């Protein structure tokens, strides 16, 4: 098994797509014609930016996906430079690696690990 998609709930889908494209510069914007839907493809994992609603609001409320980063300090600095705020950590983990969580402009958590 592997993760194929991460759904991120935001108040403004277009703003969310633009922000996450900046957060993950190697992600490619793709679309489906019927029904029309845009998403980001990051090495085969879909980052699906969808409208928050009464069932699922944006913000920190549960599971967090952690992205492997080759240079932890650089990745954290990049996220903060585009408006993410540090939420938890950084913490030292096994094998000399570090991990943290940052929050996007809608309050959703993004985990970094490397």
What positions do the PLM features span?
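Short secondary-structure boundary/capping segments
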Residues: 29-30, 38-39, 55-58, 92
């Amino acid at each position: 098994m592997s993760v194929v998609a991460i759904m991120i709930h935001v108040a403004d889908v277009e703003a969310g797509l633009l922000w996450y494209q900046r957060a993950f510069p190697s992600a490619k914007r793709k679309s489906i014609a019927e029904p029309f839907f845009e998403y980001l493809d990051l090495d085969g994992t879909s980052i699906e930016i969808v409208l928050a609603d009464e069932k699922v609001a944006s913000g920190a409320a549960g599971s967090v996906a952690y992205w492997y980063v080759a240079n932890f300090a650089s990745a954290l600095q990049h996220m903060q430079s585009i408006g993410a705020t540090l939420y938890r950590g950084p913490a030292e983990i096994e094998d000399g690696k570090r991990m943290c969580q940052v929050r996007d402009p809608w309050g959703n958590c993004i985990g970094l690990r490397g």
